[in-house]
A protein has these predicted regions:
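Amphipathic, Lys/Arg-enriched alpha-helical "gate/interface" segment within cytosolic domains
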Residues: 1-128
Length: 128
């Protein structure tokens, strides 16, 4: 996935964001997730979306496994900033992340993994 050059981009430490037909798109970057950089990312997303949860299409990248505190904070913030999440990745990566974050309880928002971004966008449209 490459960044578009026909719309406004929002750069953060852990991702680049843009809108595509009302869906917030995220191109994940590879630094290790920490509570600090996740907090900064939450603030960035809130600013981009005017504090309104938005459906997210995220292109996952390989990054180091976050520690327990970062995983906990991340899962607590999901429903604050996103209404649903579609993860696009190589087969297996999104499933690994889902198992890592939600092994013991279901996700706080609708989440689904895809290998095809067109299918992911179609699924997210129900959350617009």
């Amino acid at each position: 996935m490459t960044k578009p050059n026909d719309r406004e981009l929002y750069e953060g430490e852990i991702a680049t964001y843009w809108f595509d037909d009302g869906i917030l798109v995220s191109l994940s970057k590879s630094p290790k997730r920490t509570v600090e950089n996740i907090k900064a990312n939450v603030q960035l997303v809130r600013r981009i979306t005017n504090n309104k949860p938005a459906p997210l299409l995220i292109y996952l990248s390989n990054s180091p496994v976050p520690d327990k505190a970062a995983r906990k904070y991340s899962t607590e913030q999901l429903p604050v900033i996103y209404s649903a999440m579609a993860m696009v990745s190589k087969p297996g990566l999104a499933k690994f992340i889902m198992n890592l974050l939600f092994a013991l309880k279901k996700p706080p928002i609708p989440m689904k993994s895809f290998t095809d971004d067109k299918e992911a966008k179609n699924w997210l449209k129900q959350y617009l």
